[in-house]
Amino acid sequence: MTQPDMSQILAQAQQMQAQLQAAQQEILATTVVGNAGNGLVTVTMAGNGEVSAVTVDPKVVDPEDVETLQDLLLGAFKDAHNKVANVAEEKMGPLSQGMGGLF
């Protein structure tokens, strides 16, 4: 078995690093909207997990039933968080599979 060429390994590593940085930038530039209650509550989240907006339809604001609103807010946040995770997996997944070929 022949030893891999170090310059080739270094070039592959540099290419992977550039692809990783590009994927990270794409993730950071992504904005997703999570929702709950068929859109009655929405959470807008950036790729870094920062929440930039929360909207609540006045129909769900009931002082007698705060728990439902809390559940909807939590559901919308989780939905947005899952969408960010899916975007990250979509962008980073192919790169992690390619790392096996480095060594």
Curated annotation (Swiss-Prot):
InterPro entries found in the cross-reference section: YbaB-like_sf (IPR036894), YbaB/EbfC (IPR004401)
Assigned keywords, A-Z: Cytoplasm, DNA-binding
MF GO annotations: DNA binding
One Pfam short name: YbaB_DNA_bd
Cell compartment(s), UniProt: Cytoplasm, Nucleoid
UniProt cross-references to SUPFAM superfamilies, sorted A to Z: YbaB-like (SSF82607)
GO CC annotations, alphabetized: bacterial nucleoid; cytosol
Keyword Cell cycle: no
Chief localisation class: cytoplasm
Family designation: Belongs to the YbaB/EbfC family.
Subunit structure and binding partners: Homodimer.
Its job: Binds to DNA and alters its conformation. May be involved in regulation of gene expression, nucleoid organization and DNA protection.
Protein name as it appears in the record: Nucleoid-associated protein Cgl0243/cg0297
Species this chain originates from: Corynebacterium glutamicum (strain ATCC 13032 / DSM 20300 / JCM 1318 / BCRC 11384 / CCUG 27702 / LMG 3730 / NBRC 12168 / NCIMB 10025 / NRRL B-2784 / 534)
